[in-house]
A protein has these predicted regions:
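C-terminal beta-rich recognition modules with glycine/proline-rich loops and embedded aromatic residues
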Residues: 243, 307, 369-378, 383-467, ...
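Bacterial Sec-dependent N-terminal signal peptides
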Residues: 1-22
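Alpha-helical solenoid scaffolds that mediate protein-protein interactions
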Residues: 95, 108-111, 115, 157, ...
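Helix-terminus loop motifs that line ligand-binding clefts
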Residues: 88, 102-138, 168, 318-326
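C-terminal beta-strand-rich structural cap/linker in extracellular carbohydrate-active enzymes
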Residues: 476-479, 491, 509-524
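Solvent-exposed beta-strand/loop surfaces of large extracellular or lumenal domains
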Residues: 486-510, 529-537
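Helix-capping and short linker residues that terminate individual alpha-solenoid repeat units
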Residues: 116-120, 162, 178-183, 235, ...
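Aromatic (Trp/Tyr) and acidic
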Residues: 22-102, 106, 135-160, 202-213, ...
Length: 662
């Protein structure tokens, strides 16, 4: 039976995934390959994906959360229990299909069938009690957010397996919302205020149908994303009409003309943080993905312009050196990016990665793949506990551990396993005879008529080799992403050097590729200390609803970070036992010699990302040697040869940004 299912998966990936674009006016320039075609991911990333699959997804108590949904007695505001099943189903299916894990696939099918089996005749499949719901109040305030992920789980299962009951369940759920919300029906107002009384009003508290009031309706309107995805698959105009109705009312519901003013963000005259009093990163990303789907469907270029302009603004002002985004869950003014505290939310990491991937698919601009590489290499796995696979809520550039790794389950633990499960879908893409290598994870690609492997353990190694494994020769143009950070890339085909390689573009290699053909790739990585731009002293304050915001004051000194190509390093006390103080105050007591080049040393553990360096520093005024490790490794929250600290302890400090010795 399991063999039959895997065969169905492989077949479905060649068919159902094509249907998504049948109803779009704008085709993708890069179409992701089926997840089942990406195999044998190795190295640090492959190991951490295995941790996600075997240590976390398989042992997560999903039955408890399925019971919670199936029993349907929830009336409270809390959303953390009711979003687990949607994210878990999608993660489990993607991980099982990609790896061929039949045990996990069987478990995922059983969970899916229980959820679909519990769906009410009306189409509702959330956790809210029937006694709570009525025609005047068909959902709880956080149902829209929770069910966003259930929608996507059902649709992903259909696209990856061809399981029609999953698509039918998604349609029934959409029809439930269409029955109660729409022109002349209920709307996604963030408070009891209505237009025009709601114009430019500062909100807090909770809304009936649109989540937190401080999100100004965007936590309800985010359903434009999965419902437009349904239209792409089914061509049923009611889903397109409803999504357009939702987006057309954001200005009115928000009270701040937040949708229209995205044009000013695209013009460069307004920061994305100024759209309304509080711009929640994750929520905006989810809406942006819906806008991009509407662009694909309708061809309305203003939608692409709005989203691309917002992305550019965030990338320029609000993206951290690691590729992560969000300051206490939101976007701040100017270049305000504190180094510690509730910084870089895992939910925002997930949706920023997805949003960036969608822009890459639509535009073919390699800058988006560059941004994804930085995030994937540095921050995605920094948030993951190396042993059990649980992901942090926030993972600040400077902080302490293991406190922060052990919490939930909540939104961020679930977003963490979801984005890790999605990573294989971001590596390769194709369109006709064009094939794109966007990320250089050591792996194999086995497509319908084209196959190859990439070896070399990038980014730990600068050298990679792509070897064609297709049995039959095939005319293809292989597009290699040449990272913008790499000044002197080198590529050769069967030993012959390729000329005119430009960083920040794709290198096109067109020929009839036969079995055994080799592409050798070298991305030399510069090792250097860099000073932090736009650094300030940050002072926090709170909005009436408790949301943390920041002011800035001039700083009297500027910190530095060590980088090697796209890899960002940290001074992590787990690997610096020689200082005899595991919770070193990095800001007060550590000063780095940034004029001395760190030297490469052996890795303390084989399963960590390298290379590892030894650097010169002053600790409390005394000269010391310290070990610098890639930031991605901070999920190692205990010393391998030591006693594990309490899970809520601030046992070990770490820091990317360090002050220099004077």
């Amino acid at each position: 039976m399991r063999t039959k299912i895997i065969a169905i998966l492989l077949f479905a990936n060649l068919t159902t995934s094509l249907n998504a674009q049948n109803h779009d006016k704008v085709g993708l320039l890069e179409k992701p390959v089926p997840v089942s075609s990406v195999k044998n991911i190795t190295g640090f990333f492959g190991h951490r994906m295995e941790v996600n699959r075997d240590a976390y997804l398989k042992h997560f108590p999903i039955e408890k959360y399925v019971d919670f949904v199936v029993n349907r007695q929830h009336t409270a505001w809390d959303w953390t229990q009711a979003e687990q099943h949607g994210k878990w189903i999608e993660s489990a299916y993607l991980s099982a299909v990609q790896s061929g894990d039949q045990e996990l696939l069987a478990k995922a099918e059983a969970v899916l069938n229980r959820i679909i089996g519990s769906q009410e005749e009306s189409g509702y499949v959330g956790a809210t009690a029937k006694s709570f719901r009525s025609p005047e109040r068909p959902v709880r305030g956080m149902d829209t957010y929770e069910l966003y992920f259930v929608f996507h789980a059902f649709i992903t299962v259909y696209e990856e397996t061809g399981d029609k009951k999953a698509l039918a369940a998604a349609e029934k759920l959409a029809d439930y919302f269409l029955q109660y919300f729409g022109p002349g029906k209920l709307e996604f107002w963030p408070s009891k205020l209505r237009a025009p009384e709601n114009k430019q009003k500062h909100l807090d508290g909770q809304s009936e149908f649109a989540g937190h009031s401080v999100h100004y309706s965007w936590e309800g309107t985010l359903l434009c994303d999965p419902v437009t995805r349904l239209y792409e698959l089914t061509g049923k105009k009611k889903y397109l009409d409803w999504s357009q109705w939702v987006v057309s009312n954001i200005d009115k519901w928000s009270g701040w003309d937040a949708f229209s003013r995205l044009d000013s963000v695209a013009d460069g005259t307004l920061g994305v943080d100024k759209l309304q009093p509080y711009v929640h990163s994750h929520t905006f990303h989810m809406n942006f993905m819906g806008f991009l789907r509407l662009y694909r469907i309708t061809g309305d270029k203003s939608l692409l312009r709005k989203v691309a302009g917002a992305w550019d603004d965030i990338h320029e002002r609000q993206m951290y050196i690691t590729g992560g985004v969000s300051v206490a869950e939101h976007y701040e003014h100017d270049y305000v990016k504190p180094l510690s505290g509730n910084i870089v939310e895992t939910c925002a990491t997930m949706s920023w990665m997805q949003l960036t991937q969608q822009l890459l698919e639509l535009t073919g601009e390699s800058k988006y793949a560059d941004a994804m590489e930085r995030l994937m290499i540095n921050h995605v796995f920094a948030a993951q506990d190396c042993e059990n696979g649980v992901c942090r809520y926030h993972t600040a550039p400077n902080g302490s551990k293991p406190d922060g790794y052990f919490h939930g389950p909540d939104c961020c633990t679930a977003s963490g396993h979801r984005i890790i499960s999605m990573l294989p879908t971001f590596i390769y893409a194709e369109k006709g005879k064009e094939f794109y290598v966007n990320q250089y994870m050591p792996s194999q690609y086995n497509g319908k008529d084209f196959a190859f492997s990439i070896t070399g353990n990038y980014p730990e190694s600068e050298n990679m080799e792509l070897v064609i494994e297709s049995e039959k020769a095939k005319n293809k143009t292989i597009n290699l992403r040449i990272p913008s950070w790499c000044e002197n890339p080198k590529v050769s085909v069967n030993g012959e050097a390729v000329a005119d390689i430009k960083p920040g573009t794709y290198l096109k290699l067109s020929r009839k590729w036969g079995k055994g053909d080799k592409i050798n790739i070298i991305f030399p990585m510069e090792e250097k200390w860099i000073s932090r731009s736009h650094h300030s002293k940050y002072i926090s304050y709170r909005l009436p609803g408790g949301e943390v915001m920041y002011k800035e004051e001039p700083a009297d000194k500027i910190p530095y970070a060590f980088v090697r190509g796209p890899i960002v390093y940290s001074l992590d006390m787990v690997w610096n036992k020689q200082l005899c103080n595991d919770d070193v105050d990095m800001e007060q007591d550590m000063r780095m010699n940034v004029t001395s080049k760190p030297t490469a040393i052996n890795k303390p553990r084989k399963d960590m990302l390298g290379p590892v360096y030894q650097a010169k520093a002053l600790y409390k005024g005394s000269e010391v040697d310290v070990v610098l490790t890639p930031f991605a490794n901070i999920g190692q929250w205990f010393r391998p040869d030591g006693v594990k600290p309490q899970k809520n302890a601030d046992a070990f400090t770490y820091a990317i940004w360090l002050y220099k010795a004077e």
